[in-house]
A protein has these predicted regions:
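A short, structured active-site edge motif that brings together acidic residues
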Residues: 20-22, 103-116
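Short beta->alpha linker loops
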Residues: 25, 66-67, 88-89, 112, ...
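Short phosphate-binding/catalytic loops that engage adenosine nucleotides
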Residues: 39, 78-80, 153, 173
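Short, acidic loop-to-helix structural element flanking the phosphoryl-transfer center
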Residues: 56-97, 118-119
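Structural recognition of alpha->loop->beta junctions
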Residues: 100-108, 167-187
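Acidic, Mg2+-coordinating phosphoryl-transfer loop and its flanking beta/alpha structural elements
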Residues: 136-178
Length: 188
């Protein structure tokens, strides 16, 4: 993902994310991150669309975090209704998951705008007939926590993704999952 982002940075004139700086960016959110990268908000939709297209082109080089496939199967077998709300396209999400894993997902809401996840979360709850008090939205970004709060559902933070554990802890998640196994153990 970083390499795809850096390709776009070079083409569109904003700052690259070097590996040595990556951990510093994990604590930044929203406007602060865009400001640090020199990426104007007006360019964000175009950059996100380009990211989606490039991710589709690079699908063979992207893979799930170790243990995710097993966790999805374990959760599905235990009766957990799985859904995905993502700003990425459904096609990219399904390709990324692979056919077997994608088949475990009961509801998709993909292609969501960067700041439109809360309404999609509410829509997924209605479509799946899950009451908000029984739902948890698992994510790795501060905006995931904000969307869950706006939708009136619990947020579970995973520490192996976009934002740091400290940044996510500040959002007061219902659960913090340090490992994939920790997530599947607590939820199944």
């Amino acid at each position: 993902m970083r390499s795809i982002f850096n390709e776009l940075a070079d083409e569109q004139g904003f700052r690259r994310v070097e590996l040595s700086e990556y951990h510093r960016y994990r604590d930044l959110h929203g406007a602060a991150l865009l400001r640090e990268l020199g990426l104007p908000l007006r360019k964000l939709p175009r950059v996100m669309n380009s990211m989606r297209r490039r991710m589709a082109d690079h699908r063979g080089t992207l893979s799930l975090f170790p243990g995710i496939a097993d966790a999805l199967h374990r959760l599905a077998v235990s009766g957990v209704q799985l859904a995905i709300v993502s700003s990425n396209s459904r096609e990219n999400v399904e390709r990324f998951l692979g056919r077997d894993n994608a088949g475990l997902i009961g509801c998709y809401a993909c292609g969501v705008s960067m700041f439109g996840k809360a309404s999609k979360l509410r829509q997924v709850l209605r479509r799946s007939a899950v009451q908000h008090q029984y739902a948890i939205y698992i994510g790795d970004e501060i905006r995931d926590a904000e969307a869950a709060k706006a939708a009136g559902i619990a947020f579970g933070a995973v520490t192996w993704g976009q934002h740091s554990q400290e940044a996510l802890r500040a959002q007061r998640p219902a659960e913090i999952f340090a490992t994939v196994a920790d997530m599947s153990d607590k939820l199944s």
